[in-house]
Regions:
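Conserved alpha-helix/loop element of class I SAM-dependent methyltransferases that forms part
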Residues: 1-15
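Class I SAM-dependent methyltransferase core
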Residues: 20
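Class I SAM-dependent methyltransferase SAM/SAH-binding core
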Residues: 25-74
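A conserved beta-strand element that flanks and buttresses the S-adenosyl-L-methionine
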Residues: 86
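Short catalytic micro-motifs in class I SAM-dependent methyltransferases
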Residues: 89-90
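A short, conserved alpha-helix within the catalytic core of class I
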Residues: 94-103
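Conserved beta-strand signature within the Rossmann-like core of class I S-adenosyl-L-methionine
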Residues: 109-118
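Conserved Class I S-adenosyl-L-methionine
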Residues: 125-144
């Protein structure tokens, strides 16, 4: 399932610098780094940030990765500081989806791409209940569409995309 998301993400020109919101323990971070991108990995979990700094220390030393403790709703970047903003399988954890999407738009010059799990993925790709994922997906899609995002829905995941230029 995550392989499908990774393949889908490869089709996007993310530019050179990417803020990754909800980086967790770095699965997507590593893929972005392997694409030759500079990544600012954001998470609210101090353990995840510590892990990223340690596990990817060579990228940190090379200036290709910054791992920053911050909420999705308040990103510590200037307007348009990164080319793109990406989030994979984190949106269902974010309390204020509207604020998070607006923040990703604010810091990205070109593109915002957000992936998350559908209710059908419950128990298959993640430990969440179908009810929980359905509720969060409905909220996220309604907010995103009101903000001008495009929705693509697959069986186990969905994508919200907004191009800025």
């Amino acid at each position: 399932m995550i392989e499908e998301i990774v393949k889908d993400l490869e089709d996007f020109d993310l530019g050179h610098t990417v803020v990754e919101v909800g980086a967790g323990y770095g699965n997507t971070t590593l893929l972005l780094l392997r694409r030759g991108l500079e990544v600012c990995a954001i998470d609210i979990d101090p353990g995840a940030i510590s892990y990223l700094r340690s596990a990817f220390r060579d990228f940190v030393k090379a200036g290709l990765l910054k791992a920053i403790l911050a909420p999705a709703e308040s990103l510590p970047f200037r307007d348009g500081e990164c080319d793109s903003a990406v989030s994979v399988a984190a949106l269902h954890h974010i309390k204020n989806v509207a604020a998070a999407l607006k923040e990703m738009e604010r810091v990205a010059k070109r593109l915002v791409v957000v992936y998350d799990w559908t209710p059908e993925s419950a128990g298959v790709t993640n430990p969440h209940s179908a009810w929980e994922l359905e509720k969060k997906m409905r909220e996220a899609v309604a907010v995103a569409e009101a903000l001008g995002y495009t929705l693509v829905r697959e069986s186990l995941w969905y994508r919200l995309t907004k191009r800025k230029s």
